[in-house]
């Protein structure tokens, strides 16, 4: 193979001398083009320009992969959000730990909002007729609430087990199919602004065991503080999801996330009783939660807050003075004073009669 050597001239052209001695004149355009291209490429110390261009391609590909599922958006904290649009308004479906879970949540919402012909992320995993009937039996707001609370799968499973797949509404589990666990009378702090329910320690460790880590194991202690999610079904067949954890600071077991909403919707007050139970039959040990109102406490609160009712038949007296109607608010007080005065007058009169005529006075008294 011949060796080629280059030499530049004053005119900017270059000549190539071959091994045989022949000179070949070469045009300066390629050199100028290469120099211009070299000026346009950024020069990074220790990194080749070609390598820099190649490393920028996976970033663009990753950005495209983040939106490969319909209705899924990445979150700054590493989680994935799901959303759907209804009449040009965004409906937020919640956040999920992975992209596939968010995509499945979007598919559920799409089936409820747009019917069985809706475009979904997983068309191969088509919903069954029973699931479509379950979606049709609930409103859009109810389905969105299930997705946000991550209880859709549990409610769907319970609904299909009870035969609600063909559009029937929720049927509560009968009392004879439940095994009572324990009861707890809520305190003012349980229904106050602390947004938590303290579960008695003996009942918590017996019925809701939670693995507690030693204080030396910081990772396990953090996981214990975060707690677990427990699903409960109320007397109306609605599923509630609470975060159940152990607080090292107070050494107590508590229900936190989801409890304030339960208190608000059930209208709980201090003195009411929470009843915990579980299913007595079947392979799945379902948990149940119910509340019993304290009617005595409610009546006491009502009487203390309300004014003394007036007689329905008696109307307030109105006096017209100088063309202005003045309602007498203390008419009843004046009537009571007059009645008391009449009683005192009659008593004095009876005493006088008794002094004058003892026999007649004794008869009157």
Curated annotation (Swiss-Prot):
<keyword id="KW-0805">Transcription regulation</keyword>
<keyword id="KW-0238">DNA-binding</keyword>
<dbReference type="InterPro" id="IPR036955">
    <property type="entry name" value="AP2/ERF_dom_sf"/>
</dbReference>
<dbReference type="InterPro" id="IPR016177">
    <property type="entry name" value="DNA-bd_dom_sf"/>
</dbReference>
<dbReference type="Pfam" id="PF02362">
    <property type="entry name" value="B3"/>
</dbReference>
<dbReference type="GO" id="GO:0005634">
    <property type="term" value="C:nucleus"/>
</dbReference>
<feature type="DNA-binding region" description="TF-B3">
    <location>
        <begin position="182"/>
        <end position="294"/>
    </location>
</feature>
<dbReference type="InterPro" id="IPR001471">
    <property type="entry name" value="AP2/ERF_dom"/>
</dbReference>
<feature type="region of interest" description="Disordered">
    <location>
        <begin position="1"/>
        <end position="24"/>
    </location>
</feature>
<dbReference type="InterPro" id="IPR015300">
    <property type="entry name" value="DNA-bd_pseudobarrel_sf"/>
</dbReference>
<dbReference type="GO" id="GO:0003677">
    <property type="term" value="F:DNA binding"/>
</dbReference>
<dbReference type="Pfam" id="PF00847">
    <property type="entry name" value="AP2"/>
</dbReference>
<dbReference type="InterPro" id="IPR044800">
    <property type="entry name" value="LEC2-like"/>
</dbReference>
<keyword id="KW-0539">Nucleus</keyword>
<dbReference type="InterPro" id="IPR003340">
    <property type="entry name" value="B3_DNA-bd"/>
</dbReference>
<feature type="DNA-binding region" description="AP2/ERF">
    <location>
        <begin position="68"/>
        <end position="123"/>
    </location>
</feature>
<protein>
    <recommendedName>
        <fullName>AP2/ERF and B3 domain-containing protein Os01g0141000</fullName>
    </recommendedName>
</protein>
<dbReference type="GO" id="GO:0003700">
    <property type="term" value="F:DNA-binding transcription factor activity"/>
</dbReference>
<keyword id="KW-0804">Transcription</keyword>
């Amino acid at each position: 193979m011949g060796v080629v050597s280059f030499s530049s001239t004053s005119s900017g052209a270059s000549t190539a001398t071959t091994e045989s001695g022949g000179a070949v004149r070469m045009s300066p355009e390629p050199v100028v083009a290469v120099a211009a291209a070299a000026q346009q490429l950024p020069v990074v110390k220790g990194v080749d320009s070609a390598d820099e261009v190649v490393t920028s391609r996976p970033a663009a590909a990753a950005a495209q992969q983040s939106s490969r599922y319909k209705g899924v958006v990445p979150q700054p904290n590493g989680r994935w959000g799901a959303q759907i649009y209804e009449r040009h308004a965004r409906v937020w479906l919640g956040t999920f730990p992975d992209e596939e879970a968010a995509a499945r949540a979007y598919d559920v919402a799409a089936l409820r909002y747009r019917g069985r012909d809706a475009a979904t992320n997983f068309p191969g995993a088509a919903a069954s007729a029973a699931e479509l009937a379950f979606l049709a039996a609930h409103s859009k707001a109810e389905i969105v609430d299930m997705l946000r609370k991550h209880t859709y799968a549990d409610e769907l499973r319970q609904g299909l087990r009870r035969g609600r797949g063909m559009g029937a509404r929720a049927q509560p589990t009968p009392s004879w199919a439940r095994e009572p666990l324990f009861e707890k009378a809520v305190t003012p702090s349980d229904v106050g602004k602390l947004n938590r329910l303290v579960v008695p320690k003996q009942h918590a460790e017996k019925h809701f065991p939670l693995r507690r880590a030693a204080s030396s194991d910081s990772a396990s202690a953090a996981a214990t503080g975060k707690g677990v999610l427990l699903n409960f079904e109320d007397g109306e067949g609605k599923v509630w999801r609470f975060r159940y954890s152990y607080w090292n600071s107070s050494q107590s077991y508590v229900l936190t996330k989801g409890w304030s909403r339960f208190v608000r919707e059930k209208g709980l007050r201090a003195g009411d009783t929470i009843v915990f139970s579980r299913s007595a039959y079947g392979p799945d040990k379902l948990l149940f939660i119910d509340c019993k109102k304290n009617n005595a406490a409610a009546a006491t609160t009502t009487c203390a807050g309300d004014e003394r009712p007036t007689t329905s038949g008696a109307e307030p007296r109105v006096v017209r003075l100088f063309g202005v109607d003045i309602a007498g608010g203390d008419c009843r007080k004046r009537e009571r004073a007059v009645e008391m005065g009449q009683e005192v007058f009659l008593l004095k009169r009876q005493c006088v009669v008794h002094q004058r005529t003892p026999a007649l006075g004794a008869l009157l008294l």
